[in-house]
């Protein structure tokens, strides 16, 4: 009989406000640790410090946080932030550059946008330019454009905080909510 391969070593538990566990699921996921200038490819699970930037535009990554949160993220570039306490809120801020100059907006090319898909449960929030979405065990997409941030819910529900109107709404699947900048 063939020997079975040993399971990968488990990662230590994430520390609230300090570290999260990042496990690549598919594709290429790159990490830029807080304080570093370069990205490195995430080959196996790793514990990364809060404040790091994750490039999951060409891959899918699972994040495990203190307090038992676990969710997959893909198709986006984001920075990880996290509070302290027994069940900290983990905030993923979209960081890909938006070119919002008038010349870029009127060009024939597709308008610039940044986005992030998420799927899972725990205390996660994805923050765009004009709104932030806090998950409630679901699958969702946040898309940032120069003039708006749209949260689309594919499964479950999401609490969206509109930073412009200063109001909070609950968005249930299959609906979406768009927060627009002031005119």
Which sequence ranges carry the predicted segments?
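Flexible, surface-exposed loop/linker segments and immediately adjacent secondary-structure boundaries
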Residues: 3-183
